[in-house]
Design a protein with these regions (language model features):
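Conserved, mostly hydrophobic/aromatic
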Residues: 94, 178, 206, 249, ...
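Beta-strand-rich domain onsets/edges
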Residues: 310-311, 421-454, 520-542, 547-550
């Protein structure tokens, strides 16, 4: 009967999952999923596709272009059907697992060696095309205790900070994620009390440097418990001391059992470390770790295995790992029926392997290998995502994206819809902007209206005015605003060059983040003419014009009104590095001449007159 009930429940859950996309929902799912993308498995989440021969080439120091026009139909279909694009509604950021700190001035780029024919600029560009922030992870690539000693020296620590910030800025990443596990698993716990303050000093200094450039700081660490308790966890990471400096804490709530058979990350153990984390920092910073893999241990071996058997068949050998999306097939191959452990919220089973054959001396022999398997499945994920809802966490972090079974992804989406925030409608408008143009230096007004979907205005909401100039890929904040009682914001603005502007609001547990449409504004040039009021006939007359914005290499002509028509006089002038045109002319007769300066394919100056004496 238990088996029949379980089967019925599975059918009900499956029908719910299948029906979910058909339901009309007013809300978008809460973006609670993040995860790592190792350099060796980028193709798991993004296709390795080539751009068209006519595509814009990548230029050093310039952002890559990867919109649909850069690829053929087949390639675009592959992109849009990839893991990142089909699950982008659940994610706001990803952590490419690509970098390793080797010394204070050297960061090893594993992506390039792992993907030599797949430009990093194109990969990052496609992640941004999916609407994702890119916060790459950097591991500790130094030997035992080396990084701790680096951090003990303030000058060396500052050098490391500069090296990290330079990497972020060069690649225009949205921040950095530090995964320095050497402290925990290499250096030894006897060093933690000495290393902890050094780590804290690094985080505080790096935080200031990154935040000054509007970048994020994330850290990924093993579990930590309240230091007042007997069991403290990996206290070297000093969560309480770094809480105010970091933007994300991704807890590696997995690898509970490594050397010996057991659960990947028991539910109670996971919840305990979460409760400590949110006691020292905002829950919105905390992300629970989800393992996309399981382990298979050898528990014992009876008999002597033949030489034809796989090597390493001994009790206590290092466990084999497998992806969650292979777990069902593996269980079938192993001839086992997994059971779900309610206490740990994980799947497990035992199985045996029998090997018959010959010894090295040719004698007949046989052995039986007993094995135990543990892994998390869709139900495990549902239980852990429930902790996100219970404690209003920032979300979950998966090692690694794309390793989970489809049912697990569906559980995340179902949960994300159940806790979806109210959508916010963000509308931007511009005043004193004509057909997308403003005059150089002229004042115009940016207005916004922020409401709920039912048009109820949202008062007292923080709104950010952001700008993006041509050839830039990221938005920069230029003003902080607060909505009035009617949900509006208003601010004056001037521009010295073409740019796009938008309004954004941050998300809360109750309300979704919002982004207005992007308004492109082009700036009409301005010519400021420096010329004499009068001049003597036949003598040289010098006329200068300042082009604003200052552009070098533009061509302009000095023109004179002759019988109602504008005629070029003299030779054309090319603007110098400061955007200045210089003309030298003369007039043979006394009188009044009417002139202007015409920039080729652009504006003309105001008309001016010179009295010739």
């Amino acid at each position: 009967m238990k088996r029949a009930i379980g089967f019925t429940l599975s059918l009900l859950l499956l029908s719910t999952i299948i029906a979910q996309p058909l339901q009309a929902v007013d809300k978008e799912p809460r973006k609670i999923l993040s995860g790592w993308i190792p350099y060796y498995s980028v193709k798991t989440v993004l296709p390795l596709v080539r751009k068209l021969p006519s595509a814009s080439p990548n230029v050093e120091g310039q952002p890559s272009v990867c919109d649909a026009s850069q690829y053929g139909p087949v390639e675009n279909q592959a992109i849009e059907s990839s893991y990142l694009f089909t699950n982008k509604d659940l994610m706001k950021e990803v952590m490419p697992f690509w970098y390793s700190l080797k010394s204070p001035t050297v960061i090893r780029d594993n992506y390039v060696s792992g993907n030599p024919s797949w430009p990093i600029a194109d990969t990052v560009c496609l992640m941004r095309r999916a609407g994702l922030q890119v916060i790459p992870t950097m591991t500790d690539g130094t030997a035992k205790l080396v990084l701790s000693e680096y951090l003990a020296n303030p000058a060396t620590r500052t050098t490391i900070v500069k090296t990290i910030v330079d990497l972020v800025m060069k690649n225009n990443f949205d921040g950095i994620d530090l995964d320095y596990e050497g402290f925990a698993f290499v250096d030894g716990n006897a060093t933690w009390s000495k290393t902890a303050p050094r780590w804290v000093a690094l985080i505080k200094e790096l935080s200031v440097a990154l935040h000054a450039k509007n970048k994020l700081l994330s850290v990924s660490t093993p579990y930590v418990y309240d230091p007042k308790e007997k069991q403290k966890g990996y206290f070297v990471y000093a969560w309480a001391d770094i809480a105010s400096s970091i933007d994300r804490l991704r807890i590696m709530t997995y690898d509970y059992s490594v050397a010996r058979p057991g659960p990947m990350g028991p539910l109670a153990w996971t919840e305990k470390t979460i409760k400590y984390a949110i006691s020292v920092m905002s829950p919105s910073k905390v992300y629970v770790g989800l393992p996309g893999y399981g382990r298979d241990w050898i528990t014992s071996v009876q008999g002597k295995c033949p030489i034809s058997a796989p090597p390493g068949l001994i009790g206590g050998a290092k466990a084999a790992t497998f992806k969650m999306n292979y777990a069902a097939a593996k269980a079938a191959i192993d001839g086992a029926i997994p059971t779900f452990n309610e206490q740990y919220s994980e799947a497990t089973y035992n199985y045996t392997q029998n090997y018959n054959g010959l010894t090295a001396t040719g004698a007949s022999t046989a052995c039986t290998v007993n094995r135990t398997v543990w892994y998390q499945n869709a139900r495990s994920y549902a239980d852990r995502i429930a902790l996100v809802a219970k404690y209003r966490l920032g979300g979950a972090a998966m090692w690694t994206l794309g390793m989970e079974e489809i049912a697990a992804t569906n559980e995340i989406r179902t949960a994300a819809l159940a806790i979806a925030p109210d959508p916010v409608v963000n509308t931007i408008s511009l005043e004193n902007v004509t057909d997308g143009f403003v005059n150089y230096g002229s004042l115009f007004t940016v207005k916004g209206l922020i409401t709920l979907k039912d048009k109820t205005p949202i008062a007292g909401l923080n709104v950010t005015l952001e700008i993006k100039r041509p050839n830039e890929t990221t938005w920069a904040k230029i003003a902080d605003l607060v909505t009035a009682a009617d949900g509006t914001v208003t601010t004056p603005m001037t521009l010295g060059g073409a740019a796009s502007v938008r309004l954004t609001t941050g998300g809360t547990w109750e309300r979704a983040a919002s982004v207005s449409t992007e308004e492109e504004i082009l700036v009409k040039s301005l010519l400021q003419v420096d010329r004499p009021v009068s001049a003597l006939k036949t003598l040289p007359i010098t006329i200068k014009a300042q082009l604003l914005p200052k552009l070098a290499g533009k061509t302009a002509n000095l023109q004179k009104n002759v019988n109602g028509k504008w005629q070029n006089i003299g030779t054309s002038s090319i603007s110098d590095a400061n955007g200045v045109f210089t003309f030298i002319t003369s007039e043979p007769k006394r009188g009044v001449v009417t002139m202007r300066i015409q920039v080729v394919d652009d504006i003309a100056s105001p008309i001016f007159a010179i009295v010739i004496r």
